[in-house]
Amino acid sequence: VKLSRVVWLVVLILIIAGLTYFFYPPFRLFTFVVAGRSPVCPLGEAVKAPDNLRRQVEYKDQILRASRLVEEDPKGFELWQTPNGRYWIPAGSRYVLPFNLAEQERKIYGTGDFGPHAGDITLDCGANVGVTVHEELAAGAKTVVAIEPAPENIECLRRNYASEIQSGRVIIVSKGVWDRDDFLTLRVDPKNSAADSFVIHREGAVDVDKIPLTTIDEIVADLKLPRVDYIKLDIEGAEPKALAGARETLAHYKPRISIATYHEPDHPRVIPELIRAAQPGYEMRCGPCAETDHALRPDVLYFK
């Protein structure tokens, strides 16, 4: 009888634990950390993952409702008025802009010690149409080098920052960042201008041949930049390649870095290794985390 009671008690505990796992996300995420399925995300960031998703959707929907189409260009561009200002975007990507603006509301690329500062010279790698360029300028950056390979995004950058380009505060580099000078095929997503990639194959993407690539080190040398204070890297899976071409810049200037780590499963491990190989003095902090495939991964990592 006693054994039977023990068995039933164990079964009851397992049922309660199972229900809690599925219906109470913080407990599930806690188990990921305990089980080693969150090798980079600390417990404090891990339990925020459901709220990160909720806030992203909430902000995106708010921005979308508050935005309106101002102008359509038959060349394939649209001008939108948003709560965060006016932006030219590629036609077909109208739902991408609110999503990217929502990410900035959440400050996913960091603030304070890990974000852009007043007087900075920044490299915005994967500038897209300029949402993060706006954030860097708003923080008081002296010079923003907007690096973007996709032709339609480059045109939007030129329209969105015409006056800043004229004054020299924004410099556009119409190339991708890689580990060497080269020309590669860029896979352009006609429905998501933020998903164009040299390395990720997405269904429906259109190949654009002979897109030029260069390295961060060469950009710094070619522009004769006196220093680099901050780098944002979100380039659809090519982040390790870009870091391999930035060793001198990281070693000499030790810029603050905000880097996307969600494109490939091994990036949360590989990216810190590459950064510290170039400059061992970097301190790392985990940014917002997300649940994926019964594990937790950081969307962004910060280095200073």
Q: Where in this protein do the model-derived segments appear?
A:
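Phosphate/nucleotide-binding beta-alpha loop and adjacent structural elements of enzyme active sites
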Residues: 1-304
